[in-house]
């Protein structure tokens, strides 16, 4: 596993733990159970956030996440369904509830921590 992969898995799994602790309604599958396209996208997103071209706000990160999910064939749905590729968070960040908005802040800060992973 290279540094980019280690960083992405760290951010993803730490975010999952925080989701559980915060009792958020959606907590996705463990890293190893996600499909390869998702893992590639996450590796790229975390690598960007750990580099010079990082996005500077959780709102920008969320918009980027929505674009990436659309590219992978996902669409808005009232519930998260992996088989149907629907997700209720595929809306602008401002339309999400506080708990769901906090996920983007958590991801943003976890990427700052991940920069230290060598």
Place the predicted regions along the sequence by residue.
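Alpha-helical propensity feature that highlights long, continuous alpha-helices across diverse contexts
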Residues: 1-118
């Amino acid at each position: 596993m290279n540094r980019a992969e280690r960083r992405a898995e760290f951010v993803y799994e730490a975010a999952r733990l925080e989701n559980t602790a915060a009792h958020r309604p959606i907590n996705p599958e463990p890293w190893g159970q996600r499909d390869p396209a998702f893992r590639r996208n996450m590796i790229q997103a975390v690598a960007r956030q750990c580099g010079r071209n990082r996005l500077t706000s959780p709102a920008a990160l969320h918009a980027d996440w929505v674009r990436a999910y659309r590219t992978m064939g996902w669409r808005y749905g009232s519930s998260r369904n992996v088989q149907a590729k629907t997700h209720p968070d595929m809306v602008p960040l401002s339309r999400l509830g506080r708990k769901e908005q906090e996920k983007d802040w958590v991801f943003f800060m976890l990427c700052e921590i991940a920069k230290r992973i060598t």
